Every structure is written in structure tokens, then in C-alpha cells.
Amino acid sequence: LQLYMHEGGYCRNKHVGDYLDYFKKAEQVAKDIMDLQYYELQAEFKDIWSPQNQHNNEIIFALPSFPIPVMGNNFLAHVLPTDYKSQQGIPLTGWNGFRTPWEVYDSFDPADKRRQVHKTEYWNGKEMVTGRTGTLEYGALPMKYQENANTDGTNDASEYVIYRYADVIMLRAEAKNEIFGPDGGGTPTAKELLHQV
């Protein structure tokens, strides 16, 4: 899918070949995947990455992870502040790295499900750290990968999600938009596909 989309965009931008052929191929592959009726969107956005919900039907491709160096998912360690303490008693390492800038977080509608996978406060073992100063000065904590008790403190066993069914739907919408525009091409239209996600 992504290769066809890339090639379609390249041909369109460089004015070489028939770029629509690539978008048509991408749309067909996405349709074929959707027609399998095997994959589905999760009812709760945050559950896509939940340790209790691994191998769910939204995930098309994920890297398995184990709670050991080199084989583990250490995304959470990159996110957590160095003084973060798990309220569940899970020993976790924090490197104080990744943040979602406040201007991006604030651009989400209050009802936007992406807010569910961000923390705007955390426990440091003594008190809740809140506000937009100190370790939270640069943004919210992007915690789509939640605390997982199956961890060595840095590396946990949460699958690292690479490709989701939502990606298929969005790419099909993009391909249909390139071919037919937002409202053409029969149902579902590009707009209708977009609103599924």
C-alpha cells in the first residue's frame, strides 16, 4: 500500500508516468484487506496499545517484545521523567525524553481520543507533578504504551505496533481522494472512509 502511494505521489510530483495507476493499485489492495472482514478498529483508541489487549484485530503488523535488553519495547523509558514513580508499584526507568508539545496537545479537541494516551500530570513518589513547568515544560507525556508489569524496568513486553487497520482505511481514503476527489468513486467515498477513523 505505502509503496503504491509513494510511487503515485512521486510520479504526480515529477510529472512522469500515469500516477493514477499507482493510486488505483493502492485503493484496490486496501479494499481487498477491508473485504477480508478480519481486521477492525478497536472501540477504545487507548486499548490498541494496552498490554492486556495485545494481538487485537486492529493490529496488522507488530514487533513482538520481551522484557530484556535489545528485545524489549523501551518507548515508555524514553517518555517517562526521571522522577516518575508508578502508582501500581512497577519499577520503571525514565529518561525524560519524548514529549508531545503543548501547542500540539492543545490543538486536539477536548473530546479527541488522542488525549486519552497523554498524561498531563504524574506521580513522583511524593506528590502529583502538574502544570506546564519543570519536567512538563515542553509537553504532555505521550503514553500510548502504558505501564506493563512484564518489564525489567526499561524494556517491557508490549508489542511495538507498526501497522494498523486504521492505516489501511486512511490510505484507501487518500487513494480514493487522489483518483475521484473527496466525494466521488462510489461508496465508501474518501470522506466516508476518513470519518470511520
Regions of interest found by a model, annotated:
Residues H6-H15, E178-P182:
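Short coil/turn linking the two alpha-helices of tandem helical-hairpin repeats
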Residues Q28-D35, Y39-I179:
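Elongated scaffold/linker segments in the mid-to-C-terminal portions of large proteins
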Residues E174, K191-L194:
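Generic hydrophobic alpha-helical scaffold/packing signal
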